[in-house]
Design a protein with these regions (language model features):
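Boundary/entry segment of secreted carbohydrate-active catalytic domains
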Residues: 19-36
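Glycine-rich, proline-tolerant flexible connector loops at the mouths of alpha/beta enzymes
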Residues: 52-77, 130-136
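N-terminal substrate-binding region of glycoside hydrolase catalytic domains
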Residues: 24-26, 40-67, 91
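Sec-dependent N-terminal signal peptides
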Residues: 3-14
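N-terminal small/glycine-rich loop or linker at the start of catalytic domains
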Residues: 18-22, 84-96, 131-134
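Acidic (Asp/Glu)-rich catalytic clusters
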Residues: 19, 37-46, 63-86, 112-122, ...
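Active-site acidic/histidine proton-transfer and metal-coordination neighborhood
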Residues: 35-37, 77-79, 94-150
Length: 150
């Protein structure tokens, strides 16, 4: 009987707790997100989305990044989905911990511009990678210091 009561308590606890979460997804599930994707997501119960800025950055000419971000915003708005978070762009080269000070400054400046653009989405949080891996043990401490300083 004690086991049955314990199991019932656990099920009720989990079910009650699970009800606190809303359904969300990420733009990264679609290779090239279209407005129809967001409308379908909304119709199936998705309330929140994380915007993957890499979709607007990777392999894209620099002058097309901002227009693509604005286009992504319009598509999300058309479905009335709330942006929960923005996953800022990252790569082995777009890294705020690199040892080359000139390149690090360029990366930080670019990232600052991306963070400013996030304001139009009104996200709850941002995801920023402080570095990329792998990092050799011999330079790890300096890379951590650079990421912190950036």
């Amino acid at each position: 009987m004690r086991k049955l009561i314990f199991i019932a308590f656990m099920v009720m606890s989990v079910c009650g707790y699970a009800q606190k979460y809303e359904v969300g997804t990420t733009t990264a599930v679609w290779k090239a997100p279209a407005a129809a994707n967001f409308l379908h997501a909304k119709a199936t119960g998705v309330k929140y989305v994380e915007v993957a800025f890499n979709q607007c950055y990777r392999g894209v000419p620099v002058d097309e990044v901002i227009p693509r971000i604005k286009e992504m915003k319009a598509k999300i708005d058309s479905a009335d989905i709330e942006v929960w978070s923005i996953h800022l762009p990252f790569s082995r080269t777009l890294d705020i911990s690199v040892l080359d000070d000139r390149l690090r400054k360029e990366n930080v400046d670019f990232m600052a511009e991306m963070i400013e653009l996030c304001a139009m989405f009104q996200p709850t949080c941002l995801v920023l990678h402080p570095s990329s891996e792998p990092i050799a043990d011999s330079i790890r401490a300096q890379r951590i210091a650079n990421a912190s300083e950036s």
